């Protein structure tokens, strides 16, 4: 919460409320003297939050890419406190096999964060062309075996469950059973086995929910609605997300975007933000021991200037 610089009397937005951990901390720090808004795409999560928070926060069942339009319905056109987005998939969603996010639990191929949406993982896995499948697995999962995986998926259609898909993907990865190929160091907190289906499941989930496109829209909307002095804090969990946030902050903090060889500045761009975190903040060793899912988390923060 240090990066968000929470102070009583200001307005704050938790753009990805989830289980409400961040929202609870903001509510505590503002001592009930601030206006709080909580966004989530999952209607079930929002209902639980309503039970926990009551009238302490306003709940919005919406994708954070529609930040401005959603807040305007409540007469809010500017944010003077800050906006927080934690892009990690909710533990509640991962742990519920019936939501279809986990490659370790039996469930339908769903993966929709908002279950009112029509596109599901089943549609992508069983209906998309092989070339399109390979492209998203490579683009969103950064999986170098994407072509082989897409070919096997198409050959084994129809695929009905998460475990069936995970098994097909695992068979495409050379020496997938050799855990040494899937070790990642977490410092003194110990290593962890990375399942060979991790990248493919990430890619399908991101395609279903349009995660990167939503993030780009959210960043633009946040910058336009923040008042000078307010802060934007984003926690990412993989390189694609972090790259987008890093580049967005870099461009917003630039005072000139003219070509390097331009003799004079003609763009007239002004520096819009001050980057608070020159390097991303990562989880401490204690945090890693308490929650291994935080191993890839990176926090970046910026303060609006104009």
Sequence positions of predicted segments:
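S-adenosyl-L-methionine-dependent methyltransferase catalytic core, i.e., the SAM/SAH-binding region
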Residues: 1-306
